[in-house]
From Swiss-Prot:
Protein family per UniProt: Belongs to the bacterial ribosomal protein bL27 family.
NCBIfam families: L27 (TIGR00062)
Domain of life: Bacteria
Region (Disordered): 1-21
Pfam family, one: Ribosomal_L27
One cellular component term from this protein's GO annotations in UniProt: cytosolic large ribosomal subunit
Name this protein carries in UniProt: Large ribosomal subunit protein bL27
One annotated GO biological process: translation
Alphabetical list of PANTHER family matching this protein: LARGE RIBOSOMAL SUBUNIT PROTEIN BL27M, RIBOSOMAL PROTEIN L27
A GO MF term: structural constituent of ribosome
Keywords attached to this entry: Ribonucleoprotein, Ribosomal protein
UniProt source species: Burkholderia multivorans (strain ATCC 17616 / 249)
Lineage: Bacteria, Pseudomonadati, Pseudomonadota, Betaproteobacteria, Burkholderiales
Length: 87
């Protein structure tokens, strides 16, 4: 016969791995074509000029230049723009 009671299992002890979302390159900073500007879930920020959007809503630069953040339209959507570097 056992002399110890069976130990109960804890219902805690699990957590999901962080997804490292957010702004990766800030306003005024230089970026190369293909560089990631924002990692996001859904379109919290929208792609403006010279910015592409991946299937997971990641915003990335289409040209070399500097990043600029703006609010556009009557509903003040947050938009990310890349101002091309002078050639």
């Amino acid at each position: 016969m056992a002399h110890k009671k069976a130990g109960g299992s804890s219902r805690n002890g699990r957590d999901s791995e962080s997804k490292r979302l957010g702004v990766k390159v800030y306003g005024g900073q230089a970026i190369n074509a293909g560089g990631i500007i924002v990692r996001q879930r859904g379109t919290r920020m929208h792609a403006g000029e010279n910015v592409g959007m991946g299937k997971d809503h990641t915003l990335f630069a289409l040209v070399d230049g500097h990043v600029k953040f703006a609010t556009k339209g009557a509903d003040k959507k947050h938009t990310v723009i890349v101002v091309p570097a002078a050639a």
